[in-house]
A protein has these predicted regions:
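Short, intrinsically disordered terminal segments enriched in charged and Pro/Gly residues
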Residues: 176-178, 218-221
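Short cysteine-rich clusters marking metal-coordination/redox-active sites
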Residues: 187-190, 206-209
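Short linker/helix segments within small regulatory modules
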Residues: 196-205
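Short Cys/His-rich zinc-binding micro-motifs
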Residues: 190-196
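Basic, polyanion-binding surface patches
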Residues: 1-182, 189
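Short, non-ligating residues that shape and space the ligands of small metal-coordination modules
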Residues: 196-197, 213-218
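Residues immediately within or flanking Cys/His clusters that coordinate Zn2+
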Residues: 182-184, 203
Length: 221
């Protein structure tokens, strides 16, 4: 079965935020859709290993910020490729509290505040059925997952429902390219790919996840 056909399904990108006690936590998801028209209920997919899911199961109330093409891409790196168990994902961005849920500051296409109603267990993910509590208008064009792949040049984190392990391509250390030609380098943290002449600068950081130069490998064509 060719599961790459699934790549033709359309998705967005969203920041989910909630409180773990008094501490704001959050993550990036790509699967959210409205399932009722009146008294709206939404379905949100979260990985079983996701710390944010644990917090939502306890707290019930959470926010969903709709990422726009104009949003700071660093938000995707901070919230998408690290765990709230180990770090403060809101550091460098800040947050506001809307109806009891944290929302990361910045430009987004809109915000939703939701209350989790029930949790439907599947093999790798829970589908959270949640009642809409409040909305906040935003600005910008909602970012699709296709735009994320083509323009931002990012790839799905391993906790995403759309994640598929790709065949490894031969690579070599980023520091080995000094011939002045254009080369492609891939971040081993978030899989972001950058094209640049010669070597990456010593102080280079990934625009998505802020990883340092030593976390990049040259992609052999």
């Amino acid at each position: 079965m060719d599961i790459t056909v699934l790549f033709k399904l359309t998705y967005g990108l969203y920041v989910v935020g909630t409180f773990d006690g008094e501490r704001p936590v959050g993550c990036i998801i790509n699967t959210c859709f409205q399932v009722t028209s009146q008294n709206p209920i939404l379905a949100v997919s979260l990985n079983k290993n996701n710390f944010t899911l644990e917090a939502i199961r306890k707290n019930k109330r959470f926010s969903l910020s709709i990422i726009a093409e104009e949003s700071d891409p660093a938000v995707i790196g901070s919230f998408g490729y690290r765990s709230s168990r180990d770090c403060d994902k809101y550091e460098g961005f800040g947050y506001d509290v809307v109806e009891g849920a944290p929302v990361v500051k910045g430009q987004f296409a809109g915000r939703l505040i939701l209350d989790a109603m029930n949790f439907v267990e599947n093999e790798t993910h829970y589908v959270v059925m949640a009642r809409l509590v409040e909305t906040v208008k935003g600005e910008g064009t909602p970012m699709t997952y296709d735009y994320f792949h083509r323009v931002v040049k990012g790839k799905a984190p391993k906790n995403a429902p759309t994640y598929v392990a790709e065949e490894e391509k031969p690579r070599q250390e980023a520091a080995h390219a000094s011939d002045g030609k254009k080369h492609r380098y891939q971040c081993i943290v978030c899989n972001h790919i950058v094209e640049m002449e010669g070597n990456l600068p010593d102080d280079y950081r990934c625009p998505l996840c802020k990883a340092t130069k030593d976390k990049f490998e040259r992609v052999m064509e």
